Each structure stands twice: as structure tokens, then as C-alpha cells.
């Protein structure tokens, strides 16, 4: 990936097998964030460069294209609406169940949110505002939302500095959740 006057990524390749967890480590300015942003569709790769997954070539030039390829991204700032509940935050990612016609089926929404968080190891009251959750649980909500944004299987889940603002106990809890994803 080239920006005006600067090469940010050159001949970057890496392989990820199903169930693996990887961390990008490197000096400031080494291209970690640029690689993540290219994979997530926030930056277009230079012409002639693309992403290959499972022998399928993807032209990742937008967030929509990254989603179509099964790539999900959780920002460092999480993008949660702290004043509303976990149920509502998750529904922002995958839409509301309106099986009651035009009315939202809150019982179904609550059940779906509860299960999504339990799958990650977070047994929390999904009806309370996100502002009252701890750091690891908030990150868990963001991960659950990313995982449920579509019916397509997720190929890659990218977490941008997920432990940056977490105390030690929350880091351990988050790593437990990531291990459950394997």
C-alpha cells in the first residue's frame, strides 16, 4: 500500500489457518495498522494487489467487500453506544427481530444477545446499559456484534489493540473469550 510519498506496505503476505490466533507485532510505522485497514476494507490495496483466502481472490476495496469475504473488524474504540443496553448494541449490528410484525420482539432479542455473549464466556445482564459493563465485557459485546453482522461464515476477525485500555484481569478474560472462538 502506497500513500503519497510513502510506502506503507510492500509485498506483505501472511497465512492464517482455521482456529489460529495471531498478533501483529512491530515498531511504530512498520505497517501494522495499514495492513489491518487494508484487510478491513478501510484502505484500498494498490492496483494489482489483492487478498486470497481459501484459494479465492477478493478485491478488498471497501468495508462491504471485506464483509463479503468474511472479514470482520473490531475497532480499538469499540464503537458501542454506551447509553443503551447490550441487547440494543448487538441489534445495531445484526438488526432487530420483528417477528411480531412491525414491533420489535424484545424477548427474542434478549435471548439472542444473551446467547451471543455466553458463547464468548460473558454471563452478563444484557438489558443494562453498556456503560455499566467492565472493559472485557464491552469488548465482548463488540466482538459478538462483529460476529453476528451477517449469515456468512467469518473467515478472519481482526481486533485492533483489544487490550490497550484493559487492566490485567480484563486482559485475561478477553483472551479467554478469544480462545473460545477457536
Which role fits each region the language model picked out?
Residues 1-182:
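Glycine-rich phosphate-binding loops of nucleotide-dependent enzymes
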Amino acid at each position: 500500500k502506497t500513500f503519497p510519498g510513502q510506502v506503507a506496505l510492500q509485498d506483505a503476505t501472511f497465512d492464517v489457518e482455521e482456529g489460529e490466533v495471531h498478533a501483529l507485532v512491530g515498531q511504530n510505522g512498520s505497517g501494522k495498522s495499514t495492513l489491518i485497514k487494508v484487510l478491513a476494507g478501510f484502505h484500498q490495496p494498490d492496483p494489482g494487489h489483492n487478498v486470497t483466502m481459501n484459494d479465492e481472490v477478493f478485491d478488498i476495496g471497501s468495508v462491504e467487500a471485506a464483509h463479503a469475504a468474511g472479514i470482520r473488524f473490531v475497532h480499538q474504540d469499540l464503537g458501542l453506544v454506551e447509553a443503551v443496553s447490550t441487547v440494543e448494541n448487538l441489534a445495531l449490528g445484526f438488526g432487530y427481530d420483528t417477528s411480531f410484525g412491525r414491533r420489535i420482539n424484545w424477548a427474542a432479542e434478549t435471548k439472542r444477545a444473551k446467547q451471543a455473549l455466553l458463547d464468548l464466556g460473558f454471563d452478563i445482564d444484557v438489558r443494562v446499559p453498556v456503560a455499566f459493563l467492565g472493559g472485557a465485557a464491552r469488548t465482548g459485546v463488540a466482538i459478538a456484534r462483529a460476529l453476528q453482522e451477517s449469515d456468512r461464515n467469518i473467515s478472519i476477525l481482526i481486533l485492533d489493540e483489544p487490550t490497550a485500555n484493559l487492566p490485567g484481569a480484563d486482559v485475561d478474560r478477553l483472551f479467554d473469550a478469544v480462545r473460545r472462538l477457536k
